[in-house]
Amino acid sequence: RSAYDLAAIGTLGFRGEALAAIAAVSRVEVMTRQADAPFGAALVLEGGAVREREEIGCPEGTTMIVRDLFFNTPARLKFMKRDAAEGAAAYAAVQHVALSHPEISFRFLRDGREEMMTPGDGKLHSALYAVLGREVALSLLPCKGSGEELSVEGYISRPSCCRGNRSGQHFFVNGRYVKSRTMAAAMEEAYRNQKMVG
């Protein structure tokens, strides 16, 4: 309701809880190594239980492979959408995290095929290029503004590139993706007299 409320948003949820919930109903492989650690760790989990654990040599960062979602709770399978829809939702979630953290390299594979990889160079424009594609990234304009209580920074499209829907809008508050009708309406209002009609 105010700029103070925006400043108070810290995390918008704890992702670790979601990871534990996913691991409880799937088969998961995790490989991870901190920057200053000489070795990494590999875990194989099945239904939330650790089946294998070992020290390994691996690159810095974390890789998670999730397979056989709901293998141990078949009743839940009937509530899942088609594979394509579930894959699209997972892809969108990775896109949002990649855009909010350009300093981290993300790689998204579906059925063994790489669909996206960000460089992790800390530059938002590089992440935009990897996530949205060359054509879209090159058409965007940087924008930045600040007031007494808040600042806004990002990229906007030229009015000639506007879509008829909100699918290309991505809003982040303190590094977290948010869906906000208020922000979307404000963006539409700002563009109202700029859109090309026809």
Question: What does each model-found stretch correspond to?
Answer:
Residues 1-198:
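N-terminal phosphate-binding caps/lids of nucleotide- and nucleic-acid-binding domains
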